[in-house]
Amino acid sequence: MDNARIDLRSKYYVKPKADHPWLTRRTQSHQQVKPPKLPKKKPDPDKKD
């Protein structure tokens, strides 16, 4: 089961780039937007307050 799961993960992680462009963009957006969103949201409400 573990082996099958790793294979599926690798296949889905590598294929999404060419097969599912939206999947790769979503993953990149979440990772690239998560860190900048946290610090950006803090100063936003602080300054508006």
Swiss-Prot record:
Disruption phenotype: Loss of H(2) production on minimal glucose, complex glucose and complex formate medium. Alters production of organic acids when grown on minimal glucose medium. This phenotype was not complemented by reintroduction of the ydfW gene.
Domain of life assignment: Bacteria
Task of the protein: May be involved in H(2) production during fermentative growth.
Taxon lineage: Bacteria, Pseudomonadati, Pseudomonadota, Gammaproteobacteria, Enterobacterales
Region (Disordered): 16-49
Protein name: Protein YdfW
Additional remarks: Encoded in the Qin prophage region. It is missing about 390 N-terminal residues compared to orthologs.
